[in-house]
């Protein structure tokens, strides 16, 4: 008995057929699709995160040149409000949308009607065809992701009519600048100008353009559809050079978000393999930022349109980034990391707080048999210091999301006497953490840079300053001067002070020193709550003392002033106790840079006519979050200098051994076993004179001698 023939394949693209390798691929049925949202239209479609309200489609059979029935369906949106642009172009109202079907039911009707039309026309598999990429990439896929809908496979490949038109007519403008009207005009097609049904004219015109392309001299074939990736592919970044036009920076991410959450935020756009790199701060914790690498520049441009779209209740800022920034975060994969990340489709978890004595068997026992690690011991990666000491961190691989969820339930479970934290992680985070501990530089701990000497601020309690709050983070001094308008003429020289946060980024605050109290009050009354770059800015009077406190790291709020962290008792000028008279190894000009206890000899005997060293007074304090001064003619000082001891504090002027400020080098983190030769080898190429060996001064433990190898040195 002969078995019955197999059933015909369902409508949709056949994954077994690779059209890119077939020299003469079988033409597929085309479904011309048009859609609109309740917000922006045209090139900005989907940029405002509004819901889909309309779908119009029609089937075209390329072989017989026949077309099916034109269908139009309204979609009920969660937010019924229509933008003025949409209301004018579509003629729809909130009442008509309220009676429409939901998106999931409309998609079911779409699949049923398209399958019926394709069968009537004698076609087989079909592919969507749209005007541009916004409808699928920026509207349908993101909205389906937000509403937890599963789109049919047919929505993961499509033809961009603009690109297909540009292939046959390359002399026209770029594909990105084409529209349905310009394509019809270039082909000399007559369109129905009386058609006023929104979306119908666009679909009819697109069908006419497609039929004209099919009947062209070369018989244009729609053979290479655009592909939308269904899932994000994890893995190490192996590229040494990354195109600057393919990278964006996402800011404001929830700290617990993973690379899969970031990929879901950019649903519909093709992210390169291993292209999500979550950024870490100096402590190795996530700072709410990520660098994302896309497959091409067009995907990156579409990603920039998702600026201030939402991930849950948080809006995410999206900015341009460079390939160099991405390589710094995601690159530099070692052999150990590459081997660990070589397994694809694995979920990575990070374990933190492990006992230093814990081994692979202890971690596997902690996780338990209900959530096995992929590969057992091979699926664990322990983070260690360069000398082999454990850091208490480890990474584990799990085969699926269910096993990872089971492992996350062990969060803050006990291993020995310590509780263990478990978090979702990414391949880029594995690389960053391992790179942080992979190698130790010759001088591992660098001293903080010396800041320029701040411009002296006049004392007084008069409210002759104004404070600007809520500035855009991109605001410059020129923007502030333009914002103040006529009041900018009353600013004192060097009177504009921008405030940075602890990460060195603008905090949105600034202080302006005015010529008088009256001018400051007038500027505050005139400019309070004026708008700068779509943000209103608060302008309130304040005193110079309040400004100084904030610039030094304190805070100013309605509850009053809080002192900055640097305002400690040791920072005020001490009593002038004299030291033992001895040859000065470190001149008085540089003693203000180091703690006085580190510079004192072991014995202290009162003596006269010796230099006195103390911390700089309030007039020369380091303004830790001060950034820039408003330049006045000729220019503000820009050179970096040292804080010097006031001349009145010197009983006598010793002979300085420093010919210039740059001759002072401080070495921190020197091994206890380091000797004189080890220190001199560091400065081998800097021509340290033999008679200058005595200028190696131990710091930090006065009772030790040079031969006892102190922890810290000052080299002169």
UniProtKB/Swiss-Prot annotation:
<dbReference type="InterPro" id="IPR012677">
    <property type="entry name" value="Nucleotide-bd_a/b_plait_sf"/>
</dbReference>
<dbReference type="InterPro" id="IPR012337">
    <property type="entry name" value="RNaseH-like_sf"/>
</dbReference>
<dbReference type="GO" id="GO:0050673">
    <property type="term" value="P:epithelial cell proliferation"/>
</dbReference>
<dbReference type="GO" id="GO:0043484">
    <property type="term" value="P:regulation of RNA splicing"/>
</dbReference>
<keyword id="KW-0508">mRNA splicing</keyword>
<dbReference type="GO" id="GO:0005654">
    <property type="term" value="C:nucleoplasm"/>
</dbReference>
<feature type="domain" description="RRM 1">
    <location>
        <begin position="246"/>
        <end position="342"/>
    </location>
</feature>
<dbReference type="InterPro" id="IPR036397">
    <property type="entry name" value="RNaseH_sf"/>
</dbReference>
<dbReference type="GO" id="GO:0000380">
    <property type="term" value="P:alternative mRNA splicing, via spliceosome"/>
</dbReference>
<keyword id="KW-0677">Repeat</keyword>
<dbReference type="InterPro" id="IPR050666">
    <property type="entry name" value="ESRP"/>
</dbReference>
<feature type="modified residue" description="Phosphoserine">
    <location>
        <position position="83"/>
    </location>
</feature>
<keyword id="KW-0694">RNA-binding</keyword>
<feature type="region of interest" description="Disordered">
    <location>
        <begin position="1"/>
        <end position="24"/>
    </location>
</feature>
<protein>
    <recommendedName>
        <fullName>Epithelial splicing regulatory protein 2</fullName>
    </recommendedName>
</protein>
<dbReference type="GO" id="GO:0005634">
    <property type="term" value="C:nucleus"/>
</dbReference>
<keyword id="KW-0597">Phosphoprotein</keyword>
<dbReference type="GO" id="GO:1990904">
    <property type="term" value="C:ribonucleoprotein complex"/>
</dbReference>
<comment type="similarity">
    <text>Belongs to the ESRP family.</text>
</comment>
<dbReference type="InterPro" id="IPR000504">
    <property type="entry name" value="RRM_dom"/>
</dbReference>
<dbReference type="GO" id="GO:0060445">
    <property type="term" value="P:branching involved in salivary gland morphogenesis"/>
</dbReference>
<dbReference type="GO" id="GO:0050679">
    <property type="term" value="P:positive regulation of epithelial cell proliferation"/>
</dbReference>
<feature type="compositionally biased region" description="Pro residues">
    <location>
        <begin position="1"/>
        <end position="14"/>
    </location>
</feature>
<feature type="domain" description="RRM 2">
    <location>
        <begin position="347"/>
        <end position="427"/>
    </location>
</feature>
<feature type="domain" description="RRM 3">
    <location>
        <begin position="464"/>
        <end position="544"/>
    </location>
</feature>
<dbReference type="GO" id="GO:0060441">
    <property type="term" value="P:epithelial tube branching involved in lung morphogenesis"/>
</dbReference>
<comment type="function">
    <text>mRNA splicing factor that regulates the formation of epithelial cell-specific isoforms. Specifically regulates the expression of FGFR2-IIIb, an epithelial cell-specific isoform of FGFR2. Also regulates the splicing of CD44, CTNND1, ENAH, 3 transcripts that undergo changes in splicing during the epithelial-to-mesenchymal transition (EMT). Acts by directly binding specific sequences in mRNAs. Binds the GU-rich sequence motifs in the ISE/ISS-3, a cis-element regulatory region present in the mRNA of FGFR2.</text>
</comment>
<keyword id="KW-0539">Nucleus</keyword>
<keyword id="KW-0507">mRNA processing</keyword>
<comment type="subunit">
    <text>Interacts with RBPMS.</text>
</comment>
<feature type="modified residue" description="Phosphoserine">
    <location>
        <position position="562"/>
    </location>
</feature>
<dbReference type="InterPro" id="IPR035979">
    <property type="entry name" value="RBD_domain_sf"/>
</dbReference>
<dbReference type="GO" id="GO:0003729">
    <property type="term" value="F:mRNA binding"/>
</dbReference>
